[in-house]
């Protein structure tokens, strides 16, 4: 369908939006400051983007507040907001190539992953929430004969949304779709590594009919724009996907400002358990490789810990090493590449340091581990597998956010569960077993928000996504996500 040359030609002429969108207008940062947006796969400067700070966040929040208090969006009938959001989903698909290319150039992912997964997935999220709007009902409480008590969901007001760089368009959609569907106004702060698809999405939202000021985008550095959003007294709720350490800052910002609601989806160190009664070890090995090497391992729910029953350990690892060879990184614009570039030099350096530290801790390097240079960029790392990993090693405990897998053996079901749950994170887990009783037992005991049985990292917009412990709280996707963007309102009527 596409060739490398097709994507290269489009990349050569791609337009990059380099200004904030505030109140329906594109504008530079008030300070005039910019930051460089770099293609990690080539080290090419793509654009110098407005570096928003507190002054720009103030303007964006003021525009969002005016749109909410005075504009039509929050007061439209659900079916009217539905029509606008469905139109936005259609426009996203109409601009599928452009949006896919923006994310690929911006953060290094294979462009065909963005084309096949990210863009249609993000459009589907908008369409799903749009379709849900006229199918949600409020309640009437069973009160006394002379009273009527209604329980309704109402929008919160102004939502601050801070999203990461690993799935820029998808993560924006996960926050924006339910927030806008519920009638809120939003100020979106994309990661500084990947602002372009969010800025283009905001343009498309205006074209679809989202009123000016309802969706504002403030690119900028986290310690400036993100912090200002977290501290702003006119922001009613802050939703965040990113690292646990940054998530903790947003909790502090809420306490220091207006006690705004904060919803966090943070990191993970997700286990993948393979029991000896799994009959299709080849499939399990294929999925285990996908679970850690897809998107260069830059996935919050990546299955970065592999726990294998000792009786099949050696055979399974041999199969897995063969599957890992399919995930060698390549040019992200080459449709044949299954893995691309690491997002930037800082992340690359962090992954390489983790690999070196793991060897110093005594883990056995089974495969990969090398930094590669492709197209003049050294932001490429081989799929890396370590064996003999003890639970006290940093490799088993800290999120690396890269293509690095920690492999350990276990001797019993109880030991497997103990090792799996021995983590400060609780986002996701996978397990492989053909014993239905065991699958149910183990799934119930795993401390994770999502457990995938005989697959890895299962996901659908109709199913809530999120975790516990230091992976955060609250749920993205599905109907429960409306809880983050609405509040219950009780209204009493005294009847005569």
Regions found by a protein language model. Give the residues of each.
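Rossmann-like NAD(P) dinucleotide-binding subdomain of oxidoreductase/dehydrogenase enzymes
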Residues: 137-283, 410
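Residue-level signal for inorganic ion chemistry
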Residues: 24, 43, 81, 103, ...
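Conserved C-terminal structural/oligomerization subdomain of aldehyde/semialdehyde dehydrogenase
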Residues: 44-48, 235, 328-329, 355, ...
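Glycine-rich loop-to-alpha-helix module at the N-terminal edge of alpha/beta enzyme cores
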Residues: 46-136
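Hydrophobic face of amphipathic alpha-helices that form TPR/SEL1-like repeat modules
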Residues: 1-42, 67
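Short, well-ordered beta-strand elements within core beta-sheets of diverse protein domains
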Residues: 46-52, 69-73, 161, 272-276, ...
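ALDH superfamily catalytic-core signature
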Residues: 237, 245-390, 453
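A short hydrophobic/small-residue beta-strand
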Residues: 185-187, 365, 450
């Amino acid at each position: 369908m596409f060739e490398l040359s097709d994507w290269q030609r489009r990349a050569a002429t791609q337009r990059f939006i380099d200004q904030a969108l505030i109140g329906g207008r594109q504008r530079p940062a008030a300070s005039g400051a910019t930051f460089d947006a770099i293609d990690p796969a080539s080290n090419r400067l793509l654009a110098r983007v407005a570096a928003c700070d507190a002054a720009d966040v103030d303007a964006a929040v003021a525009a969002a507040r005016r749109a909410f208090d005075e504009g039509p969006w929050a007061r439209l009938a659900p079916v009217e907001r539905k029509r606008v959001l469905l139109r936005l989903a259609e426009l996203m698909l109409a601009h599928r190539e452009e949006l896919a290319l923006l994310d690929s150039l911006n953060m290094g992912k294979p462009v065909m992953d963005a084309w096949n997964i990210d863009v249609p997935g993000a459009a589907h999220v908008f369409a799903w929430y749009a379709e849900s709007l006229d199918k949600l009902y409020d309640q009437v409480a069973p009160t006394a004969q002379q009273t009527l008590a209604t329980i309704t969901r109402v929008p919160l007001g102004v939502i601050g949304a801070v999203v990461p760089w690993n799935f820029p368009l998808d993560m924006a959609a996960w926050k924006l779709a339910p927030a806008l569907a519920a009638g809120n106004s939003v100020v979106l702060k994309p990661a500084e590594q990947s602002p372009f698809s969010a800025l283009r999405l905001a343009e498309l939202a205006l074209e679809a009919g989202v009123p000016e000021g309802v969706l504002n985008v403030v690119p900028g550095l986290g310690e400036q724009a993100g912090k200002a959003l977290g501290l702003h007294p006119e922001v009613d709720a802050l939703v965040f996907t990113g690292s646990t350490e940054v998530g903790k800052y947003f909790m502090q910002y809420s306490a220091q400002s207006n006690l705004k609601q904060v919803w966090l989806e943070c990191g993970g160190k997700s286990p993948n358990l393979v029991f000896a009664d799994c009959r299709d070890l080849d499939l399990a090995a294929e999925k285990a490789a996908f679970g850690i090497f897809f998107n260069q391992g830059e996935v919050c729910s990546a299955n970065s810990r592999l726990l294998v029953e000792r009786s099949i350990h050696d055979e399974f690892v041999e199969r897995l090493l063969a599957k890992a060879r399919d995930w060698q990184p390549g040019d992200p614009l080459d449709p044949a590449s299954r893995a691309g570039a690491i997002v930037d030099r800082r992340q690359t350096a962090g992954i390489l340091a983790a690999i070196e530290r793991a060897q110093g801790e005594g883990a056995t390097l089974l495969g990969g581990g090398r930094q590669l240079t492709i197209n003049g960029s050294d932001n490429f790392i081989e799929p890396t597998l370590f064996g003999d990993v003890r639970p006290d090693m940093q490799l088993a405990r800290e999120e690396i956010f890269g293509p690095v897998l920690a492999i350990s053996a276990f001797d019993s079901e109880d030991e497997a569960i103990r090792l799996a749950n021995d983590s400060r994170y609780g986002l996701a887990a996978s397990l492989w077993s053909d014993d239905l009783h065991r699958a149910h037992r183990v799934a119930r005991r795993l401390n994770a928000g999502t457990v995938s049985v005989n697959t890895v990292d299962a996901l659908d917009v109709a199913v809530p996504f999120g975790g516990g412990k230091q992976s955060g709280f609250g749920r993205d996707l599905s109907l429960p996500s409306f809880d983050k963007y609405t509040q219950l309102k009780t209204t009493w009527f005294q009847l005569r």
